[in-house]
Design a protein with these regions (language model features):
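Non-catalytic, surface beta->alpha helical segment in thiol-disulfide oxidoreductase systems
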Residues: 59-86
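Non-catalytic interaction surface on structured domains
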Residues: 23-28, 46-47, 71-72, 81
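Structural micro-motif
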Residues: 49-58, 68
Length: 89
């Protein structure tokens, strides 16, 4: 499975929603709180093509997207593959 990182703040309802989806799918992830750390937010922004909003979700340092994006991908049955969850035949 890929290393999943989610950049969050402690006051973001979309972060809670994104983490809830990952937890529901039993996906292990590393949460990086950028609430009070401008250097971490800048790092996240650089990796997220300039986006400063949270959450931002990455799989093996590759941007997957924000809360809306991961829910859209999940509804389209594409999220598992991007996160490295698909079973090999």
């Amino acid at each position: 499975m890929k290393k999943i990182e989610i950049y969050t703040t402690n006051y973001c309802p979309f972060c809670v929603k994104a983490k809830s989806l990952l937890n529901k799918k039993k996906i292990k992830f590393y949460e990086i709180d950028v609430s009070n750390d401008e250097a971490l937010r800048e790092k996240m922004s650089a990796m997220a093509n300039g986006a400063r909003s949270v959450p931002q979700i990455f799989a093996d340092n590759i941007l997957i997207g924000d809360c809306d994006k991961i829910h859209k991908l999940d509804n389209e049955k594409k999220l598992d593959k991007l996160l490295g969850l698909e079973q090999k035949a």
